[in-house]
């Protein structure tokens, strides 16, 4: 399980780097974004920011907020679908707690590497039997579809002509802002806390708690070295993530919980049974046998004494 957690944390870091830099190329001589993703998605976003900022006279700060909200609303169905799959996995874990808990307890109480391996295999087998993914039900396809949009808006917020010289609420958009960094960190931390809502499985809650600081920490670190225009995009993104989490917690999760319970009511699962780990043998002698043996010896000696 520890290796899976390390893999998940590493994947988050790599995914974040890919989101920010992997989808858009940057010209080494000019430092300007180029490539298919930028020309197809990023450049129109930059033009939209300029339109709201200059043509409508709203300023670059408000323009970044508007374009970010529009982009987030476009990809919101993908985010909801991704959360739907993860929530379905969570609800299955909650409903099958009585089936999986013995394996989880066995894994916690294992003392040797062999016992831990056997317990893990038994747990994974039970999860597979009931259609539960060991990776939490999160698919790669929705994430991959969202990445070009995240990358494009990231570069659009940073490289739109005129944004580096502008300001928003007295905050220069061309240099880092500690106020916006703090806001972004708090918002993503709140979103992480909201993701715990409705998760009843103890092991799953522990995994989420251990990763709860990763997203805010990564946002804060990147924001410290990014202009305020980019951090403003992350602040708005944090609000949208909280909105998405509320939709999942209070609309998606209740429906999925009802669906899972109805399915399990029709086809109730059987509690998993597992044998004791091989390698442990009970060498304690049976007490009744020992008592019977003593009685036989006593009767034999008594017969000898009478014959004498």
Curated annotation (Swiss-Prot):
Segment forming the signal sequence: 1-22
Annotated gene: yidC1
Lipid attachment in record (N-palmitoyl cysteine): 23
Stretches the record annotates as Disordered: 263-308
PANTHER family with a match to the protein in the record: CYTOCHROME C OXIDASE ASSEMBLY PROTEIN COX18, MITOCHONDRIAL, OXA1
Function recorded in the entry: Required for the insertion and/or proper folding and/or complex formation of integral membrane proteins into the membrane. Involved in integration of membrane proteins that insert both dependently and independently of the Sec translocase complex, as well as at least some lipoproteins.
NCBIfam families in the record: PRK02463.1, yidC_oxa1_cterm
Alphabetical UniProt keywords: Cell membrane, Chaperone, Lipoprotein, Membrane, Palmitate, Protein transport, Signal, Transmembrane, Transmembrane helix, Transport
InterPro entries: YidC/ALB3/OXA1/COX18, YidC/Oxa/ALB_C, YidC/YidC1/YidC2_Firmicutes, YidC_ALB_C
An example Gene Ontology biological process: protein insertion into membrane
CDD domains: 5TM_YidC_Alb3
Topology of this chain in the membrane: Multi-pass membrane protein
Record's keyword annotation contains Manganese: no
Family indicated by similarity: Belongs to the OXA1/ALB3/YidC family. Type 2 subfamily.
Cellular localisation: Cell membrane
Membrane-spanning ranges: 60-80, 135-155, 168-188, 211-226, 232-252
S-diacylglycerol cysteine lipid attachment residues: 23
Native organism: Streptococcus pneumoniae serotype 4 (strain ATCC BAA-334 / TIGR4)
Disulfide bridge partners, by residue number: none
HAMAP family, A to Z: YidC_type2
GO molecular function, one term: membrane insertase activity
Designated name of the protein: Membrane protein insertase YidC 1
